[in-house]
Swiss-Prot record:
Glycans are attached at residues 64, 200, 208, 453. PROSITE patterns: GH16_2. Residues 529-540 have a biased composition (Acidic residues). GO terms for cellular component: plasma membrane; side of membrane. This is Probable endo-1,3(4)-beta-glucanase AFUA_2G14360. Belongs to the glycosyl hydrolase 16 family. Residues 379-423, 509-551 are annotated as: Disordered. It comes from Aspergillus fumigatus (strain ATCC MYA-4609 / CBS 101355 / FGSC A1100 / Af293). Residues 390-410 have a biased composition (Polar residues). The keyword RNA-binding does not apply.
Length: 652
């Protein structure tokens, strides 16, 4: 009895053979369907124009699309074909910029299939030229390169070359009309690659004299075959648009062997170009019987010839009727592309904002102030404080926007994502000032009453209010730099705000590169009365009749947040250094960081004499100081805890 391991090996071999045969039969039973096609104007509009330095070190200046069209280097002929030529009028300096030419690249990368190019004319057999129709993967040489049509100088036969990484050997015993001169496609052969020399007349002058023809490449995971058909010998199935490679006959190149084509040749973009001299044409210039102006340097002789003989390159042009890509089971409505090749199509970085309960700041509830209902589930960041935030009674918190940050809608406990081209982190600044009725639409919010939650000032002092600013993106879309998630800051007997006494948030200013210079004025002045003084142990609040903020912007740390809470409340973090006027007439310098909630109440008139109240907590130093206005009016002081209250009482 045979060992079980032997039986398993035999069974695996039989199974593998059956699977391979089945796959081959399935492939043979399929037909190629058109997946991509270009002709005429689509070459100009749907391909990228490469205008960088020549990777092959040629004496060439590749031009962009606009210049190529204006100068006539690319155009659509009367017959509808695509013309792509070179400058054949300018005499050049051999030590200057190279001859103008065009290199176009497909925008997408493509995988296995049947590639068909119908060429009416290709660059002729001209000294110094190096035309090519080829493909290359994103990561050279690992993803491979396929040179379908390539030749230099006076050559009249095409050279088909494959390049890839490692070792990739193909057999010379495959049936083909061309001649295999190198069987190693990988780096083991240096930069030579595996090379098949085509039949005479497959490129250059003889190709053009016979009216051009069609090249077809079949690329699978096991082989690459390339056919050349002169104009008079194009297969009927190919001409009808229903290609059947089994009727194509013997290919010019049949590259197959121990090389793993599925691993060595990945998705490729197509390239058509004409360069001059360079690493190949320049180095073999002397071997091509081209004129040697410098016997010691074939390369310099090539450059001299190209620079000083413009008329020689009148025939160095491509005229292409079409390029088509066929694939199994892929309709023309589907894309054969596997990825985008241009930066303009790259997916952007996703930016998300998350509402976190642990970062929710708590503010004391004033006894007689108008407050804004807190959102039950959603925080919506407005895209523009002036244009997009409208008054609403919905339970929504509106944050004024900063230019350059994305619009983010965040659901509590979840994410909302936005695409952009890149991600940055920003620190915003904000300026708050009273505005007239016509500007009150800049902050959204409602006039609904809300019950008090009994939050005390002591709780405020102990609450962490660090709220990280979300990532922003340079997408050019307006958005917000922070989201303030305030706990239910409510009051008893909340009043409806007067239309003439709304205090709204101004648009966020541009991001400062450095903190602003101190301004020699108090942050806020106004008139007050004793009835607005807070009733809590450590709550510091007052009624502000005409609040104003210094003209300079105040930087908000990245760990803070600034928001307009509804239409009548504003919560912000401030940091500044000010000269504070004292009741005695002297001034005191004070550096302060404060978290304040401004809640305007009903006004007395439209002249700005309305009473408004504010809640303020300060970690350390004086932020608002007493200012005298209209005799008996006073303003409360922002200090920490009981010391602040005692200090206010002493000043009073």
């Amino acid at each position: 009895m045979a060992p079980s391991s032997l039986l398993l090996s035999v069974g695996s071999l039989i199974t593998s053979s059956l699977v391979s045969a089945t796959a081959l039969e399935a492939r043979q039973s399929q037909t190629y369907q058109l997946a991509e096609s270009w002709q005429g104007e689509s070459f100009i509009n749907d391909w990228n124009f490469f205008d960088g330095a020549d990777p092959t070190n040629g004496y060439v200046t590749y031009v962009n699309q606009s210049f190529a069209k204006q100068s006539g280097l690319v155009k659509v002929t009367e017959s509808g074909s695509f013309y792509m030529g070179v400058d054949y009028e300018s005499t050049l300096n051999p030590n200057g910029a190279g001859r103008e030419s065009v290199r176009i690249e497909s925008k997408n990368y493509y995988t296995e299939g049947l590639y068909v190019i119908d060429i009416e004319h290709m660059p002729g057999s001209i000294c110094g030229t190096w035309p090519a129709f080829w493909s290359v993967g994103k990561n050279w040489p690992n993803d491979g390169e396929i040179d379908i049509i390539e030749g230099v100088n006076l050559q009249k036969a095409n050279k088909i070359v494959l390049h890839t990484s490692g070792s990739c050997d193909v057999s010379g015993s495959n049936d083909m009309t061309g001649t295999l001169s190198s069987s190693e496609c990988g780096e083991a052969s240096g930069t030579v690659g595996c090379v098949v020399k085509g039949t005479n007349g497959s490129s250059g002058d003889p190709f053009n004299e016979s009216g051009g023809g069609v090249y077809a490449m079949e690329w699978t995971d096991t082989f690459i075959k390339i056919w050349f058909f002169p104009r008079s010998q194009i297969p009927a199935s190919l001409a009808s648009g229903n290609p059947d490679t089994s009727s194509f006959g013997t290919p010019m190149a049949h590259l197959q062997g121990s090389c793993d084509f599925a691993e060595r040749f990945k998705a490729q973009k197509l390239i058509i170009d004409t360069t001059f001299c360079g690493d190949w044409a320049g180095n073999v210039f002397a071997e091509s019987t081209c004129p040697m102006s410098d016997p010691s340097s074939p390369m310099q002789s090539c450059v001299n010839y190209v620079a000083q003989n413009p008329a020689a390159f009148k025939e160095a042009y491509w005229e292409i009727n079409s390029i088509k890509i066929y694939q199994y089971g892929v309709s023309a409505a589907s894309s054969a592309a596997v990825s985008q090749a241009t930066a303009s199509k790259v997916e952007g970085t996703r930016v998300s904002a998350q509402a976190a309960n642990t970062a929710t700041p708590t503010v004391p509830a004033p006894v007689e102030t108008t407050t804004v209902p807190q959102p039950a589930q959603t925080n919506t960041v407005a895209t523009s404080a002036a244009d997009h935030a409208t008054p609403s009674s919905a339970e929504t918190t509106t944050v004024p926007a900063a230019t350059g940050a994305p619009s983010v809608s965040a659901t509590e406990g979840g994410d909302s994502e936005l695409e952009s081209t890149s991600t940055v982190y920003v620190t915003s600044t904000t300026t708050i000032c009273p505005v007239a009725e016509s500007s009150s639409a800049a902050a959204a919010g409602g006039k609904e009453d809300a019950p008090s939650n009994g939050t005390s000032g002591a709780e405020v002092a102990a609450t962490s209010v660090a709220a990280a600013a979300p990532a922003a993106a340079t997408s050019g879309h307006p958005g917000a730099d922070a989201i303030a998630n305030s706990a239910a800051a409510t009051s008893t007997d909340a009043q409806s705000e007067s239309a003439t006494s709304r205090l709204t948030a101004g648009a966020l200013s541009e991001i400062p590169t450095a903190p602003p210079e101190p301004v020699s004025q108090a942050v806020s002045t106004g008139s007050f009365d004793d009835s607005d003084t807070a009733q809590g142990d450590s709550e510091e609040q007052g009624s502000i009749a005409s609040a104003s903020v210094a003209p300079s912007t105040i930087p908000v740390p990245a760990s803070s947040s600034a928001a307009a809470l509804g239409g009548s409340s504003i919560a912000s973090s401030f940091a500044s250094s000010r000269l504070i006027p004292r009741p005695t007439g002297s001034s005191t310098a004070a550096s302060a960081t404060a978290i304040a909630t401004w809640s305007p109440t009903a006004g007395e008139s439209a002249s700005g004499t309305a009473k408004e109240s504010a809640t303020l907590t300060t970690p350390s130093e004086v932020f608002f100081t007493p200012g005298l206005s209209n005799g008996a009016n006073r303003m409360s002081v922002g200090l920490s805890g009981l010391i602040g209250v005692m200090f206010i009482a002493a000043l009073a």
